[in-house]
Amino acid sequence: MALYSKKTDLSSASSGGYTGVADVYQFWNYHHRGDGNIGDKPSYTLEQARDQITRGNVTWNGENVFGKPAALTYSFLQSVSDANMPDNYKGFVKFNAAQIQQARLALQSWADVANVTFTEVKNPQQATIKFGNYTLTSDGHTDNNSQAFGFYPGNWKWAGSAWFNYNQADNQRPDINEFGRNTLAHEIGHTLGLYHPGDYDASDGNPGYKDVTYAEDTRQFSIMSYWNEGYTGGDFHGYHAAGPLMDDIAAIQKLYGANMTTRTGDTVYGFHSNTDRDFYTATDSKTPLIFSVWDAGGNDTFDFSGYSSNQRISLISGTFSDVGDLKGNVSIAAGAVIENAIGGSGNDVIVGNLSDNHIDGGAGNDVLYGDGGADILTGGAGKDIFVYAWEKDSLASAPDTITDFQRGEDKIDLSAFNKNHDLQFVDHFSGAGNEVLLNWDGQANQTNMWMHLSGHSSADFLVNIVGTALQPSDFIV
């Protein structure tokens, strides 16, 4: 389903002169999926991608056993002889301290989103998941080519084990946002039953994006993918995700169920994060954030206030945001709800959802769209545009509040309602419909913007604008 399917077709409203609606309309179509082809590849819905990544139908609960929790153990191998190494690799090296620390963090990222628990045990023979390094090929030569491999769930000796080429520097130091940490999370995905999104493998020929089954097989959508996010319009500036992404979360939740105990309080992602997860946390304006958020409850906030770039922030489940000068680097997993957003000092576009959102644009010339719900909208410094595009964006029974409208600087964009150029500002409603009435409430110190769209006896639409008496010139129609 298109993200804008329930709303007015804005294509005509967004053509011609500039409107805030134009930015919102473009953002609604951002990374739209599941409808036709992208280039010569079919575009998959989230559900289709989920099923593709889980096409092996294997879990630690058995084949074709879905949605059942799993209590797993893990261990770090201490010694393996060449004769006992899997796939004829040789030259065992045990995990170093940095690898152990980062492996624990990578395991936690999977446990956060699905009903899988991981308990560390000392004896590898008692462990479900085992970690080790290799250094040599089957003929005893130093392996400078391969990266890592992992085995799916099963009942044979090395099922659920993950192996890493210790000759690769990024495997020795798998830091946040680097390929080594990404590789850890990827291989753990295999040990839990996830496949590559396409039928390719680094050990089989020289695969490329030409070999993908569907267009969204990139590292923007899935940590299980081999392919650069640029193929789907993302840009991570050479950085990498450290935990499961949107399609991975859907896939692992299919296998083991969703973890509904994860972050049920009021959680902040980005700056001032209280997640206790490094990949959800920004410490300064140079921090690259690459994540898909899973959150099981509370009143939650995207805080991207420390960035000065022009950002596009979406609070709609299943969509992407452009955060901190990257593109398509933040997403919200299906079923998760984030209620609030704080922009930075650039010219941001922020789109809310059907919850009661609190959206703060920060400095810069921002475009804010609250969508449904009783939203609180704060533009901040700069020339801001507050967009309304749907008759249910601000109901009379649950109105939005604009907290800091500045006459001569800010605008309220109603052009989506004026496609036929019949929206009128009036002193009183006539019952004809498509009328806007501005009423100054001195006691409340606000302008009440009423709209009578349908022509029946009561107003359909109300926005409260604090602190100033508005005139028709304050609107884009």
Task: List each model region and its residues.
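Parallel beta-helix/beta-solenoid
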Residues: 298, 335-346
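Acidic glycine-/aspartate-rich tracts in secreted/extracellular proteins
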Residues: 79-81, 124, 135-138, 169-170, ...
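Acidic, glycine-rich calcium-binding repeat modules characteristic of RTX/beta-roll
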Residues: 14, 91, 171-179, 202-216, ...
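Low-complexity acidic/polar repeat-biased segments
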Residues: 328, 335, 339, 429-477
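GD-rich hexapeptide-repeat beta-solenoids
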Residues: 71-73, 77, 82, 140, ...
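Metzincin-family zinc-dependent endopeptidase catalytic domain
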Residues: 28-69, 98-219, 226-235, 284-288, ...
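Disordered inhibitory propeptide/activation segment of secreted metzincin zinc metalloprotease zymogens
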Residues: 1-95
